[in-house]
């Protein structure tokens, strides 16, 4: 039995609206070219928290708390055609979205 080729796309961004818009654009492009798309699956949001001293000298108890959230989405394109790969390469995504593509 031959194994099917699969493209795994992982998106990361700080803004969830931007990542959902990009995921919808990728799904639409892949479906238009006749590929089967599984996803987008929302992965757990990673939160990094930082404590920063407000005062440069004294008042150690006075601090600011900052956090940055990294949203992630995962999708698989099963049995892609050459047309699908070309369309995905030509796709223009916003600057705030990090895209990782693996061919399996």
Curated annotation (Swiss-Prot):
N-terminal signal peptide: none
Domain of life: Bacteria
InterPro entries, per the entry: Ribosomal_uS10, Ribosomal_uS10_CS, Ribosomal_uS10_dom, Ribosomal_uS10_dom_sf
Gene Ontology MF term list: structural constituent of ribosome; tRNA binding
Family annotation (SMART domains): Ribosomal_S10
Pfam families xrefs: Ribosomal_S10
GO biological process: translation
TM spans (from-to): none
Assigned keywords, A-Z: Ribonucleoprotein, Ribosomal protein
GO cellular component, one term: ribonucleoprotein complex
Known role: Involved in the binding of tRNA to the ribosomes.
NCBIfam families: PRK00596.1, rpsJ_bact
Quaternary state and interactors: Part of the 30S ribosomal subunit.
Family designation: Belongs to the universal ribosomal protein uS10 family.
Record protein name field: Small ribosomal subunit protein uS10
Annotated source species: Polaromonas naphthalenivorans (strain CJ2)
């Amino acid at each position: 039995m031959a194994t099917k080729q699969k493209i795994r796309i992982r998106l990361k961004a700080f803004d969830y609206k931007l990542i959902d818009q990009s995921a919808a654009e990728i799904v639409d492009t892949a479906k238009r070219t006749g590929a089967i798309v599984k996803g987008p699956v929302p992965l757990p949001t990673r939160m990094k928290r930082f404590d920063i001293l407000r005062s440069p000298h004294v008042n150690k108890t006075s601090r600011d708390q900052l956090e940055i959230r990294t949203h992630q989405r995962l999708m698989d394109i099963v049995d892609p055609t050459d047309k699908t790969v070309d369309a995905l390469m030509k796709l223009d995504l916003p600057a705030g979205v990090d895209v990782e593509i693996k061919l399996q």
